[in-house]
Amino acid sequence: MAPQIKRIGVLTGGGDCPGLNAVIRGVVKSASNLYQWEIIGIEDGFEGLINGMTRPLTQSDIKGILTLGGTILGTTNRGNPFDFVDRDGVKKDLSSVVIENIKRLSLDGLVVIGGDGSLAIANQLYKMGAPVVGVPKTIDNDLSATDVTFGFDTAVNTARDALDKLQSTAESHHRVLVLEVMGRYAGWIALHAGIAGGADVILIPEIPFDRGKVCDKVRRRFQGKTGFAIVVVAEGAKPFGGEIVTQAPAEKGRLERLGGIGNRVGNDISMCMGGDIDVRVTVLGHIQRGGTPSARSEERRVGKECRSRWSPYH
């Protein structure tokens, strides 16, 4: 028989996305109203479990956060307890510290709201005996255990809205407009937004692209009566035989920072068109992570469902 649950912890890890606060709200409302559990908020992801940065979460803490972007608990891409990098750049395994802090806080359960990296850490902690429930969040939609992650739909809507605006200016000025979107090594945002926004070319990480074919497609748009073109490229896309473009390498516990492929594609198109066509590049960037979650998102229900997924210490 599972032990009686009295206190749970909740943290948000990795990159932020729309809907994090809605999940936190769902967890707190369900746990406190239905089961009278005490909820402990862990600040700045797993770093909070390592450094003991926690605070109680009550009904007053979640007022007005349903549609609020970001996360009231803070988050970080650093702080992997299994590969923690200290200020001197020394890597340490602090997973035992996390397990001890979970026990010290008397947590009967831990809700980890995160993407592939955070949930991989959560799975490792579960194997060490921690009572963990993972909530799949990421704008990248790259988690295999669920069809759609929360945050993805809102990011797609943001990218599609940008395409709507770019299309009118591209047509007015007879330009090629290249839009670089996020997604890391997955092309879901580029694909869905590109289709919805009527892009002429969509480049995704899963399919290396041929520079010549991209240029041919753009050239045909200008040979006809259209006179403009829209290209959507995911940040992790790369040409045949090429490498993913990065802005910064992986170091000090951080993942490599992707970005720059949009400008590469724009330069390629400009060169193959002989410089006769005006090519402009827009990098959508972190605007895809912010703002109010879309109406289609199901963060509140996900937050409330956490309570039925507990596993006891094993």
Identify what each model region corresponds to.
Residues 141-143, 147, 249-253, 292-294:
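Short beta-alpha connecting loops at secondary-structure transitions
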Residues 284, 289-301:
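Mobile late-domain/C-terminal helix-loop "cap" segments
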Residues 13-16, 42-47, 77-78, 115-118, ...:
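Short, ordered loop/turn segments at secondary-structure junctions
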Residues 101, 112-114, 120-124, 131, ...:
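Accessory alpha-helical/coil subdomains and C-terminal extensions
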Residues 1-13, 23-108, 113, 117, ...:
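A cross-family phosphate/adenosyl-ligand binding-site feature
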Residues 299, 303-314:
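Positively charged, low-complexity/disordered segments
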Residues 49-110, 116-197:
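Small/polar-residue-rich loop-to-helix segments that shape phosphate-bearing ligand pockets
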